[in-house]
Structure formats: structure tokens, C-alpha cells
């Protein structure tokens, strides 16, 4: 039997849920208004992937900050060491899935945000050399 989603936040214009969380993998669901920055530039020691369900997400990926905008059905996998940031694009809300493999503490970090508790997890500032290039990322504009 599949686990039930762990709803962390649900308001009129935003939502966040943990769908799967174990050491090997976490999958989270998010919904945010359009035109909103979600994260600034950072790197992980693990892979992070995004699948757009609705709306658009705008990414900056790699040492050069290559801009990529993906609509519904779009997918990007960002390998370990590749700098990235993203947000919702346009004026429409967006819904998407985020996959961390391995989890790297992301699910605990999300729970900590809700509880107002700082939780350390696998995230770091972009290194001085900018990290690895965007060519390492896997981008599928639409499935």
C-alpha cells in the first residue's frame, strides 16, 4: 500500500507535501503562485530533479547560470555539484514534484520549516568556481 501524503502546508495559494521520504529518496509536491522565487543559487551532494505538473518553473542551472523555463510535463535532473536556483514563472500558479536522491535530509528540512526549527541538510552555497556546468543536467522540455 502506498503511503499517504504528509501535508505540511495548505493555504489558498500554496501547498507543500511529502509524498515519499526515506534514506534513498524523497519526493515532495509543491504549489506556489506565479512569479515567485523559490530558492537562490545552491548546490547539493546528491541529485535533485523536478517534474512540472502545471504552470511554469524558471531555472538557472550551472556555473554559467543557464536559464531554462519548463512548462507542464517538463523535467530537469540536476546532478550533485551543479549550481541551481528556481522559481515559478509567469503569472499563473505552478505545481510540481521535487525528487532528492538520496534524500539528503530534505524531508526533515521541510518539516523543520513548518515547525520553525533549523535542520541541517545537504545544501551548500555555490563554490567560488561556480560549480559544474549546466551540460551535466538532464533536461526534457516535455514528456
Report residues per predicted region:
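Short, conserved beta-strand element in jelly-roll/cupin
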Residues: 30-32, 43-59, 99-101
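Ligand-binding loop in jelly-roll beta-barrel domains
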Residues: 72, 80-107
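A short, N-terminal "cap"/entry segment at the start of jelly-roll beta-barrel domains
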Residues: 1-28, 33, 39-40, 114-143
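Short histidine-centered beta-strand/loop micro-motifs
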Residues: 18-20, 38-44, 61, 68-69, ...
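Short acidic-glycine-tyrosine-enriched beta hairpin
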Residues: 64-80
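A hydrophobic/aromatic-rich effector-binding and dimerization subdomain
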Residues: 99-123
